[in-house]
């Protein structure tokens, strides 16, 4: 199996919505973003699948070393072997990859967040940075696109936090800000014990409003001239906002079950969004400034 095939299998096997957003990219960009996504999956799996924190720390340290080796032209892992040639084509700073690992390390060292300002740093590291790297791969002309990419990454992460409240609690993690839990009189230990608090839907509604504000901010920050190049992010936005709407329609009962979109529905959303953005781009090219 080639490094590229390894990364593609990693992305497809995860069942992630991101996979569907990559399907409409040119081959070179698709290979690059698959390698980036596979890297994120590998380091995320370290903290999600390793029950011994000391072992997880050592594995993350190994990935730090492997990342440095990749940028030095000496990759050993299939993921970094797929990433290495990508580094010659795109502006992907090594510091960004190290910061992603820093974010994963926060899952080991900090499993509570006193306020949203603390949580925002975590979102920046594990998702905002990924957005910035993705924007470099997709391409852009205006630097405001980087603001869009980081805001969008945070929006995705906030959506994940809402969806995964129960699963995260089962791992001993609470991403809902503690000051907001206190405001709604929700005991963090109740979440950890899987107990259902009647006030949780109201709190999650506030979290959803915050996530939607980041989606809106991101779309407002995206220059029209870069919109088509960044269409994968727009595909993901459509999928994730649909997911968030489904969670809302279900009454935020995330402690009872996990809301999912079927693969067919994700594919349909991805295809229709990509087609809509292609039509919009054609109209943009017909404007007087570009005709």
Q: At which residue positions do the language-model features occur?
A:
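Catalytic cores of Mg2+-dependent Asp-rich isoprenoid enzymes
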Residues: 1-157, 162, 166-291
